[in-house]
């Protein structure tokens, strides 16, 4: 009736959100700081491999995890250290929400693969809980919370392509003139991010060499111009030598990708996933097929970038007393 207030929205029975994996097109690692962290300059690109998180009201916080497309989730924690669960709890605490949720994660991104799957879980959990509890905090506020959970969480929320500085949490969007096509080769085991950074520090101390000069301008120019050859030439990762020292098979994986026709290959982040740049999505599919005899189909993923950041896929309302949802 005219003048009546809008009815209260129905309570939500569940919310499902997803967030993308990332590849580092550039990763410059500064000297180790007194607090143990390193100043980074990186170019993130979100890619079309996703983590999907569903949150439902519960009496207490809990989490379950399943793998999608052959992703091994055996190493994913199911306790209070899980990033998605930590994200839900942190948002409830900061927003003054006195309700708990059960978090269910469907993982497509390799675990401990240098593609920020755990950070994507946290980003999706923040977006899902924000929707479930009708907080409407906005991405910037969620990203500020996300930075407390991990350096890659803010990028998981924003997605696309961005330059990251600090520990990677300060983001500036980068315009891209074309999409990128990738083949990701999964390793048979994971690599510890702290161990890779420590090996990078050790190698620099042993050789007396500091961080090499960066290629940020070259990467940005290649992205703006949509030039796949220039992008391939500009790909750079200061952690690659350290990752290859800890897992010598990685160098062979990069070389195999180049021999099979990849424009370029790079260890993704701290590894051990190897990212192979292709000329097009069709070329990426052919490259993956050519690499199957070497690595097996279960260790190969194709994807494109840039992909959007975390977003809600589905919000299910609680049925009304009359039976309608």
Curated annotation (Swiss-Prot):
The keyword Oxidoreductase does not apply. The active site is at 22, 152. Its EC number is 2.7.1.148. Gene3D superfamilies: 3.30.230.10, GHMP kinase, C-terminal domain. ATP binds at residues 110-120. It catalyses: 4-CDP-2-C-methyl-D-erythritol + ATP = 4-CDP-2-C-methyl-D-erythritol 2-phosphate + ADP + H(+). SUPFAM superfamilies: GHMP Kinase, C-terminal domain (SSF55060), Ribosomal protein S5 domain 2-like (SSF54211). Residues 306-325 are annotated as: Disordered. Pfam families: GHMP_kinases_C, GHMP_kinases_N. InterPro entries: GHMP_kinase_C_dom, GHMP_kinase_C_sf, GHMP_kinase_N_dom, IspE, Ribosomal_Su5_D2-typ_SF, Ribsml_uS5_D2-typ_fold_subgr. Belongs to the GHMP kinase family. IspE subfamily. This is 4-diphosphocytidyl-2-C-methyl-D-erythritol kinase. The gene is ispE.
């Amino acid at each position: 009736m005219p003048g009546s207030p809008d009815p209260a929205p129905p309570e939500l029975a569940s919310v499902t959100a997803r967030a993308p994996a990332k590849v580092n097109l550039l990763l410059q690692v500064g000297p180790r700081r007194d607090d143990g962290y390193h100043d980074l300059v990186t170019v993130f690109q979100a890619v079309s491999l996703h983590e999907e998180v569903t949150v439902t009201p519960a009496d207490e916080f809990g989490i379950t995890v399943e793998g999608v497309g052959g992703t091994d989730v055996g190493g994913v924690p199911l306790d209070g250290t899980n990033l998605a669960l930590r994200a839900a709890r942190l948002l409830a605490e900061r927003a003054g929400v006195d309700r708990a949720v059960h978090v269910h994660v469907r993982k497509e991104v390799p675990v401990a693969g240098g593609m920020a799957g755990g950070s994507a879980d946290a980003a999706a959990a923040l977006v899902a809980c924000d929707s479930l509890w009708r907080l409407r905090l906005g991405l910037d506020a969620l990203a500020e919370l996300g930075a407390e959970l991990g350096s890659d969480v803010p990028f998981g929320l924003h997605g696309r392509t961005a330059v990251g500085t600090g520990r990677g949490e300060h983001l500036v969007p980068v315009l891209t003139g074309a999409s990128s096509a990738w083949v990701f080769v999964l390793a048979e085991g994971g690599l510890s991010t702290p161990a890779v950074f420590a090996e990078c520090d050790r190698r620099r101390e042993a050789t007396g060499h500091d961080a090499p000069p960066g290629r940020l301008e070259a990467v940005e120019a290649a992205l703006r111009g949509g030039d796949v050859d220039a992008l391939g030439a500009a790909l750079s990762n200061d952690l690659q030598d350290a990752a290859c020292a800890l897992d010598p098979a990685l160098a062979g994986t990069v070389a195999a990708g180049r021999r099979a026709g990849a424009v370029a290959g790079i260890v993704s982040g701290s590894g051990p996933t190897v990212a192979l740049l292709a000329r097009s999505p069709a070329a990426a599919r052919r490259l993956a097929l050519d690499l199957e005899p070497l690595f097996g189909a279960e260790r190969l993923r194709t994807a494109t970038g840039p992909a959007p950041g975390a977003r809600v896929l589905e919000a299910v309302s609680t049925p009304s007393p009359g039976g309608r949802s």
